[in-house]
Amino acid sequence: MTTIQQQRTSLLKGWPQFCEWVTSTNNRIYVGWFGVLMIPCLLAAAACFIVAFIAAPPVDIDGIREPVAGSFLYGNNIISGAVVPSSNAIGLHFYPIWEAATVDEWLYNGGPYQLVIFHFLIGISAYMGRQWELSYRLGMRPWICVAYSAPVSAAFAVFLVYPFGQGSFSDGMPLGISGTFNFMFVFQAEHNILMHPFHMAGVAGMFGGSLFSAMHGSLVTSSLIRETTETESQNYGYKFGQEEETYNIVAAHGYFGRLIFQYASFNNSRSLHFFLAVFPVVCVWLTSMGICTMAFNLNGFNFNQSVVDANGKIVPTWGDVLNRANLGMEVMHERNAHNFPLDLAAAESTTVALTAPAIG
């Protein structure tokens, strides 16, 4: 009994030091308990992604024995290459390497894709938790991790929720540049995402956030308090940790209030920076919600053949032009996996060309 107790004591002797090191804010890079989960997951995802991008064999993404190559060694470049999503034959089944009969089978069915996205999603979730943890240790407010939840929600939407709704991980976003574009085209063709209000909010958040960031940066830079001569860099006029304001917010407020109108300009630095944070974050949240609803085929607005004249004849609109583009993309994607596109098979026949009204 004494021997067993001594062995346990020796094994646990370094545990307090390990705990102190993990939670110490004096480390050059904070680890944290979430970091203990984050680091191995992100390393595994990055390692598998790099190896698969370079050397993975073609993947039978559609489940029809027509493999699609995505790696460098099979003729792709940095633009066309991707980690190809797992096969439609696998569907939503969890497909770790031990579920396959051989490694060749695992590679052929796109096993690396699931390995990468699952470790990646766990890793970025742990990174978000680590942001909260470090804020807590330093006595800061927790809004940094709340802001980071916006891109995390987007990643979960395209890598997890959308495949769940569509019934297969083969519908997830490929891990590559051209693959991402293909995902976007197919998403538009099948769900009309450009006509979804939540996607519109996301566009407003991205472009609006960029605009507000540029406006704020240029206003601050233009109203710096002079601390240097003409021959010195203006950056030398600021010392890290100084108590004095480095720019004149009254001047910036006065300029912008006169450029637009008074109440378009913030007179409170705290409310200004809160707005700069919350606007793009909420808009990206809305976009993620839109992806999640369209995953279950609650799609964007449909204005096909919505305008008719007094005789009941259809007057083509831009809604019909957009519908033609969607149909064109839909008939061309996964060409050999379908006998006929679902949208064309389930609806009335659509004219191939928009006809001009007869004159006279």
UniProtKB/Swiss-Prot annotation:
GO molecular function, a single term: electron transporter, transferring electrons within the cyclic electron transport pathway of photosynthesis activity
Sequence positions that bind pheophytin a: 127
Residues that, per the record, bind chlorophyll a PD1: 199
Transmembrane region(s): 30-47, 119-134, 143-157, 198-219, 275-289
Origin: domain of life: Bacteria
Residues annotated for Fe cation binding in this entry: 216, 273
A Pfam family matched in the record: Photo_RC
A single GO BP: photosynthetic electron transport in photosystem II
Keyword terms, alphabetized: Calcium, Chlorophyll, Chromophore, Electron transport, Herbicide resistance, Iron, Magnesium, Manganese, Membrane, Metal-binding, Oxidoreductase, Photosynthesis, Photosystem II, Thylakoid, Transmembrane, Transmembrane helix, Transport
First-listed, main subcellular location of the protein, grouped into a coarse class: membrane
The protein's name in its UniProt record: Photosystem II protein D1
Organism of derivation: Prochlorococcus marinus (strain MIT 9515)
